[in-house]
Amino acid sequence: MVQRNAPKKAVHFGAGNIGRGFVACFLHNSGYEVIFAEVNDTTVQKLNSQKSYKVIEVGADGTSESTITNYRAINSRLNEAELVQEIATADLVTCSVGPHILKFLAPVIAKGIDARSTDLTPVAVIACENAIGATDTLAEFIKAPENTNPDRLADYDKRARFANSAIDRIVPAQDPDAGLDVRLEKFYEWVVERTPFADHEPPAVEGIHWVDNLQPFIERKLYTVNTGHATAAYHGYIRRKSTVYDALQDREIQEEVKKALANTASLITQKHGIPQDEQQAYVDKIVRRISNPHLEDAVERVGRAPLRKLSRKERFIGPAAELAEHGKDCGALLDAAEMAFRFQNVEGDDESFKLAEIMEQNGPEDVVKQVCGLEPKEKLFPAVVDVVKRVQADTQSD
């Protein structure tokens, strides 16, 4: 196993705001050439014609800028062969495309790994998504028989290692005239599991915090940051607030957020042994972050994709189901889920229209099974059925 005798190279799928502003920024600062794999040809052309862009970090103490260079872009839809060769010789493959897109990345990544020499250090594959076990999910797609010959799996760890991660950074909607520049908050957290690299050094990336057990970090993040952010957005949308900041100036909404995070805190502290005062300090910090007036974010943008956010392993149903099984309070999470069920027919969000269709065409029990992935035997099931009944009754009376 040898290192490539070449500058460090990373392939990143997804040249959106998180890809350019968060992941690529750290890769650039760590000395990697970044190859963006992107399906939007306009974005590909912009990246290839513009040799730098700015990342603007916004905080209570003002703003700071950094310039990102040393990157290229490949249209992954049109130039697969070129992308396969880049993956075959990359040190690192990352992505920020949304959990539902991972299956579409798998074929080309599988081809790149298959073409990789076992003389090289295995390529590190890290999915940077708001989902528990996203890299495991991607790995399953990559190793599936339709993408990888099963005979090649025997020595697969000589070609690739897969590490789950938890990412945390608020990237609001951008100015339409910003071009490639990205504006985001100064705070960040990028935690990656170390165990897949037990027999050699993990990739050197500035900003990554390597841990042996990722689950406490990713659940704390998903069930605090994402739960809090979405709770504010959905309650804010129903109360006709324009931004998350506006929503959190409303005392009632602020209380709803705090109650939801008290629900999740009780799960996190018990399940992962995190001291209550430490978790409360984390909650307080998160509420301050999502209340940042410099990161104006429309409630419609933060609330988009309600079907995903109401799913079984996501920010509301995931923690609520665990709490219910232990007989613990999850009332505020159910209240937030109710607001998410009311997020229907929102312009620009396909899932909100699909949600309205599901709610109209199905009985409450079937809605809960289909949308939330809950089964009747689970203790949370009847409570969510009641939520759906309430929303359906109100919708029919409108």
UniProtKB/Swiss-Prot annotation:
Keywords: NAD, Oxidoreductase. The keyword Translocase does not apply. GO terms for biological process: mannitol catabolic process. It comes from the Eukaryota. The active site is at K221. It holds the Pfam family Mannitol_dh_C. One of its GO terms (cellular component) is cytosol. NAD(+) binds at A10, V11, H12, F13, G14, A15, G16, N17, I18, G19, R20, G21. It is an enzyme of class 1 (oxidoreductase). InterPro entries: 6-PGluconate_DH-like_C_sf (IPR008927), 6PGD_dom2 (IPR013328), Mannitol_1_phos_5_DH (IPR023028), Mannitol_DH (IPR000669), Mannitol_DH_C (IPR013118), Mannitol_DH_N (IPR013131), NAD(P)-bd_dom_sf (IPR036291). It catalyses: D-mannitol 1-phosphate + NAD(+) = beta-D-fructose 6-phosphate + NADH + H(+). GO terms for molecular function: mannitol-1-phosphate 5-dehydrogenase activity. Monomer. Catalyzes the NAD(H)-dependent interconversion of D-fructose 6-phosphate and D-mannitol 1-phosphate in the mannitol metabolic pathway. PANTHER family: ALTRONATE OXIDOREDUCTASE-RELATED (PTHR30524:SF0), MANNITOL-1-PHOSPHATE 5-DEHYDROGENASE (PTHR30524). Belongs to the mannitol dehydrogenase family. This is Mannitol-1-phosphate 5-dehydrogenase. It comes from Chaetomium globosum (strain ATCC 6205 / CBS 148.51 / DSM 1962 / NBRC 6347 / NRRL 1970) (Soil fungus).
